Design a protein with these regions (language model features):
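Residues lining the SAM
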Residues: 141-145
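A short acidic, Gly/Pro-enriched loop at the edge of an enzyme's catalytic core
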Residues: 129-138
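Short glycine-dipeptide loop
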Residues: 165-171
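Core SAM-dependent methyltransferase catalytic element
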Residues: 217-236
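C-terminal alpha-helical "lid/dimerization" subdomain adjacent to the S-adenosyl-L-methionine
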Residues: 172-223
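A short, conserved alpha-helix within the catalytic core of class I
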Residues: 147-160
Length: 236
């Protein structure tokens, strides 16, 4: 099992969270227990993405296929679905995983066993210190809408990840927005409920704020909207 330790190394026990996570951050992570992760691909990537957020998971897989490299870091990998199905440029990519939830790290590591990924239990809202060489691609797929704060404050994640990128490296991902995008009434009700349950914190997340925060940090960037989801990439 994976233990979340302060050094971000692999150990043998399995607390759910890193000790230094804040209560607000912890709420968004602890919901991803083993039971939920067992139905995550069907419920989240299948039903919610298609029928509520109006962005089928194939669009997210296309983003991976376009931007992933053979030297990749995934922050908040969920179940590892996209890493399992995307096309890497080589048969033996270097893969590292960062998450604050040991369950997610364990499930993804097992799923990607053929790639021997290295796991680190870290909070992306804090400075990330890991003993590892920089990466050529970093994914933050479905992470931002689960983090506390607004796009303006939670974009500090990009500041923490930028030092982990090689020059010319790309950070990419997606996030579900509430402002500046079109949503159906069922989608809005679902989003409101997920915010009430503290699974999401995105009622103030705005499309223009995302574009602004990326542009302030990366000269070369792009944001594309499908449904109420923003798919983005930015180059260091």
């Amino acid at each position: 099992m994976v233990k979340c330790s302060r050094l971000g190394q692999k150990e043998t026990q399995n607390p759910t969270m890193a000790d230094r996570s804040t209560p607000e951050t912890r709420t968004g992570y602890t919901v991803y227990n083993k039971a939920l992760l067992s139905i995550y691909d069907f419920m989240v990537l299948g039903f919610l993405c298609r029928f509520m957020w109006k962005c089928r998971s194939r669009h997210l897989l296309e983003l991976y296929n376009q931007r992933v490299t053979s030297n990749h870091l995934d922050v908040g990998p969920g179940t590892g679905y996209f890493l399992d199905h995307c096309r890497f440029p080589t048969n033996r990519p270097r893969i590292a995983l960062i998450d604050l939830n040991a369950n997610s790290l364990s499930v993804t590591k097992k799923r990607l066993l053929r790639y021997a990924p290295v796991t680190y239990c870290k909070d992306a809202l804090e400075l990330i210190n890991i003993d590892a060489e920089p990466f050529d691609s970093v994914a933050v797929n479905g992470l931002l809408h689960c983090l506390p704060g607004t796009i303006r404050t939670k974009s500090v994640v990009f500041d923490h990840l930028k030092p982990l990128l090689n020059p010319g490296g790309v950070v990419f991902g997606c996030t579900i927005l509430n402002k500046g995008v079109k949503k159906s009434i069922p989608a809005q009700l679902t989003m409101n409920w997920l915010n009430f349950m503290k699974v999401f914190t995105n009622l103030q997340d705005d499309l223009e704020d995302l574009r602004t925060e990326l542009s302030q940090r990366f000269q070369d960037n792009d944001v594309r909207v499908i449904g109420c989801m923003a798919l983005f990439w930015a180059r260091k």
